[in-house]
Amino acid sequence: MGVVLITVVTVVDRHKALPNSSIDVDGHLWEFLSRQCFVLASEPLGIPIVVRSADLYRFSSSLLTLPKACRPIVRTRGATAIALDRNGVVYHEDRMGVSIEWLSVLSGYNHLNSSLIINQPYHLWVLGAADLCKPVFDLIPGPKRMVYAEIADEFHKSWQPPFVCGKLFETIPWTTVEHNHPLKLRAAGGEDTVVGECGFSKHSSNSLVRPPTVKRVIYAVVDPARLREIPAPGRPLPRRRPSEGGDARPEAALARSRARSVHGRRRDAAPPRGPAGARRPPGGRRDVDGTPTLGSVRPDIHTLKGRGLSPVPHLALWVEQWFLALQKPRLYTHHRLALHNIPSILKGEKREDTFEDNRRDELRHDDSRHRRHRGLPLRARSPPQCQPAPPRLGPHLRRSRGRGGRQLQRRGGAERRA
């Protein structure tokens, strides 16, 4: 089944920008977010896979309790980096063999969607800065959930996402709720809506303490492909700004769309329909008066007479087939025989075309073509009402029977015709 949901856990500054690397953020804030991620990973939305930056090893003690296969890491600063001192804080990385290593989040995402592992639904959690989260928004399609802590400071080096956190997508502030409902949001009216709540109440032993530098914790659902807000359940769809592709005056846009639809109907009027109850034959086209056009369908005259309809207006269809038979007589032999049968059909008689009739007509055609080539007079055709006589072959042709059946063979034996 693969990855069914992606949740990004990160930090943003007052400009809604992400830090370039994990070392640009205080370690206590990463510890707070890692515990938030550990709490949320218990929701029943698939097998949790929490991937983080390798330099957050010291601040991810709560995530180390997960199975080794569920807590991979990505070494964003290279394979040789082990520790980095920043403002007196040492950011240690995982030692070799402590955790499963991915080359990137994209490679791990493709691995979870491949057939190399068990086919199960996976919920991918991404904990880190822009060096880890940026490929998730740029290279992995589809909407994603975001959980980020907003601080009042400003990062020296940052990355501004194209969807601008908190501006183009609706955000929901997180508050603490009862410990038996860790993933629900307490609405203003007293009703609970399942959208994603984090934290425990003061009665819980694992209460989470928010760092003083954090203004608020935000939950949002973003889709960089659409670049518009996705409202929470029960909330109306917000109006888009002109910079986002919306209209400054929605009433004027609605009036213009109505005017275009009215003018379009006047300019492109629908063609008049046939009489009520008239059914269009399958695969056929109708003329202005409702009759099938030439070449559209080949109606059955017996069916028309059985329904009380006159077959005479449809004789033009057989006339057209007659001209086609003159151009390609071998392919349209059955149409020519059907044209010969018209007089008997109109009299109420029913005559079926047989294999002998088709074969006799082919032999007559071969003899006529040969006489035209030799300059000999053509033989007269028999009337269509009676049974046509078998054609007489010229003196230079003889009838022979071989393994392939009846054949026309020259006496010299140089040429054969099937």
UniProtKB/Swiss-Prot annotation:
InterPro entries registered for this protein in UniProt: Herpes_US2_varicellovirus (IPR003485)
UniProt feature, compositional bias: Basic and acidic residues: 241-250, 353-369
Taxonomy, superkingdom: Viruses
Pfam families: US2 (PF02476)
Annotated Basic residues bias: 257-266, 395-404
Ranges for region Disordered: 230-304, 353-418
Similarity annotation: Belongs to the herpesviridae US2 family.
Name under which the protein is recorded: Gene 68 protein
Organism (species): Equine herpesvirus 1 (strain Ab4p) (EHV-1)
